[in-house]
Amino acid sequence: MLNKLSLLLKDAGIPLTDHQKNQLIAYVNMLHKWNKAYNLTSVRDPNEMLVRHILDSIVVAPYLQGERFIDVGTGPGLPGIPLSIVRPEAHFTLLDSLGKRVRFLRQVQHELKLENIEPVQSRVEEFPSEPPFDGVISRAFASLNDMVSWCHHLPGEQGRFYALKGQMPEDEIALLHEEYQVESVVKLQVPALDGERHLVVIKANKI
């Protein structure tokens, strides 16, 4: 699995240390193990997880601005866990409302010794925003309008929303509330992954 990950990272142009690679593989192995009992993801094959979960998450890392992030509706830690491994200098709050997912995240935190994550069980609209975050991240969480509506209190004045999407969400962008502005839409290149991937970056401060 290490060889496959190294090749994928090379194709993606993402240089990582051996320690970071081993952490990512350990996370995949834990996800595969816990998935049998906890049903954390529909992806069953660890090699497929490397592409659809690991690479699909970390290709976003170069576009994140700031040091404090919150991953809303993180599920089993996607994209928050892979991003925290790639960006060890940043801090990631991993938010999910289901206890079994948060228990898994805490076990990952313990076994991988990840000091820059904080798993939290809470609904996003009930989670306090002090201090505010530099970025609010979501992957397959909600429409753009629902994301900014439910998470409007989380980013700081210069914070941003980072929405990971599949196909270009033109309809969602057209319907976005007027007080929010799409700063950029990045077409992401994920090696060995069929289908399109886009990152929508939305300014949190009102126009």
From Swiss-Prot:
* A cellular component annotation (GO) from this entry: cytosol
- A GO molecular-function term, please? rRNA (guanine-N7-)-methyltransferase activity
Q: Which UniProt keywords apply?
A: Cytoplasm, Methyltransferase, rRNA processing, S-adenosyl-L-methionine, Transferase
Which positions bind S-adenosyl-L-methionine? 73, 78, 124-125, 139
Is Acyltransferase there in the keyword field? no
Q: What is its main location?
A: cytoplasm
Q: Which reaction does it catalyse?
A: guanosine(527) in 16S rRNA + S-adenosyl-L-methionine = N(7)-methylguanosine(527) in 16S rRNA + S-adenosyl-L-homocysteine
Q: Which domain of life is it from?
A: Bacteria
Compartment(s) where it occurs, according to its Swiss-Prot or TrEMBL record: Cytoplasm
Q: Which residues form a coiled coil?
A: none
Extract the HAMAP family matched here: 16SrRNA_methyltr_G
Query: Which protein family is named in the record?
Result: Belongs to the methyltransferase superfamily. RNA methyltransferase RsmG family.
Stated name of the protein = Ribosomal RNA small subunit methyltransferase G
What species is given as this protein's source? Shigella dysenteriae serotype 1 (strain Sd197)
